Amino acid sequence: MTSPQPTETADVVLVGAGIMSATLATLLNDLQPEWRMLVLERLDAAGLESSNAWNNAGTGHSALCELNYAPQAADGTVSAEKALTINEQFQVTRQMWSSLVENGTLEDPNTFINPVPHVSMVFGDDHADYLRARYDAFKPNKLFERMEFTEDRDLIAQWAPLTMHGRGAGRVAATFAPEGTDVDFGALTNQLLNHLQGRNITVEYGQEVTTLDRQSDGSWLVSVVDRLNSDNNRVIRAGFVFLGAGGGALPLLQKSKIKEAKGYGGFPVSGLFLRNTDPTVTAQHNAKVYGQASVGAPPMSVPHLDTRYVNGRRAIMFGPYGGFKPNFLKHGSLLDLPKSVRAHNLYPMTRAGMANLDLVKYLVGELTKTRSQRIDALHEYYPTAEESQWELIEAGQRVQVMKSDPQKGGVLQFGTELVTSADGSIGALLGASPGASTAVPIMLNLLSKCFPAKMSEWEPRIKELIPAYGRKLNDDPRLTDEIMGHTASVLGIK
């Protein structure tokens, strides 16, 4: 079969105009400004899928309050290691954002990031004992030194007033991290891409990538359908391709036919949130309050009562309530999941599914919940919430990674996964949380995998953007104070 003839060329093609592509394009444009890059988005604007503010929790994932990053072991101990890794990654992201604010790439930081304390709150003896053990494991670390723990109801009421209004008897425990943030990744994505337009980078909308053909010289022929005018369909020859299309990355990765893609599948999980925009309510809550996920529930289902800042307005979200649709994207197709099944991933997906029947049971239970049951769940965190003040909204799709495993046959993986070809000519990002908050370190990892010969040349400039690049802040208290103090000052956070 002959390959289609290219009508134009680009050094880099990035598929999907979300936070990942925007971050990678920003890095590459700074490191190689002469490279011609194209960002291709199938929808009519940037950041409309998982990067959109209402399609994610905007937590600024730094493992300050998300309890699933530090589960309790069978012997009762809690390790801070995974949480430290995530926090270190977020500090890398913060450093780059600070540099981009300073050089004018990003606008006033309060248009995309705001200080919102992160709170963990649990109920009952077992959960309270766990939270204390978690606090004891976290507190000695430099990155978590500002964390506080209490079971004092009056103090918790100061941290998160709505959670204690009308609360009945029973043990309550909470931790408080004042350095927490809320991030509008949709606004951030748009600012990055708007700045890049015209700087040897073109961002095009309504453009759907349909096929990827690898050439003998290592380049790729990228077939693009113009969704508004088929007369403009074209083929682009690209030296490097990045698939940053969220849930849409997996089908495109499969079309690339690289051997590294074999064994990968995806399991889509949808989510619903209750949202309150009444100023009389939102003014009383300035915290992200995270609880414990129910048994069998996926990590992204951890209940949380979240302060959000979107377009300068304050709101509160509660959720998520899990759901299932076979779409890989919110604006995707019901055929996404069945069409992704291949001979090479059928067994891993089957094995992963059999090992996660609790998840299936959880999703079935979530799908059958009534509105009153959802309000009951809200009342666990905001006892006096009035049902009439809350609207139900649909969040973005999260396509969890399913992949082959030598011991188990197949596993369901919560998190992100970078898949790159051996020659470094194509890379794809699969998975979900913590995702956007760790976009910068993930994209730096992609650069090291796909452009290893360039890293020594790029390193001095990377260190200008990210002063502590290559170093762990938690191991160097003085460096931590210097870096976190500077980024907090530039970004207007605590």
Curated annotation (Swiss-Prot):
It catalyses: (S)-malate + a quinone = a quinol + oxaloacetate. PANTHER family: L-2-HYDROXYGLUTARATE DEHYDROGENASE, MITOCHONDRIAL. This is Probable malate:quinone oxidoreductase. GO terms for biological process: tricarboxylic acid cycle. It comes from Kocuria rhizophila (strain ATCC 9341 / DSM 348 / NBRC 103217 / DC2201). Its EC number is 1.1.5.4. The keyword Oxidoreductase applies. Pathway: Carbohydrate metabolism; tricarboxylic acid cycle; oxaloacetate from (S)-malate (quinone route): step 1/1. Its cofactor is FAD. Pfam families: Mqo (PF06039). Gene3D superfamilies: D-Amino Acid Oxidase, subunit A, domain 2, FAD/NAD(P)-binding domain. Keywords: FAD, Flavoprotein, Oxidoreductase, Tricarboxylic acid cycle. Belongs to the MQO family. GO terms for molecular function: 2-hydroxyglutarate dehydrogenase activity; L-malate dehydrogenase (quinone) activity. InterPro entries: FAD/NAD-bd_sf, MQO.
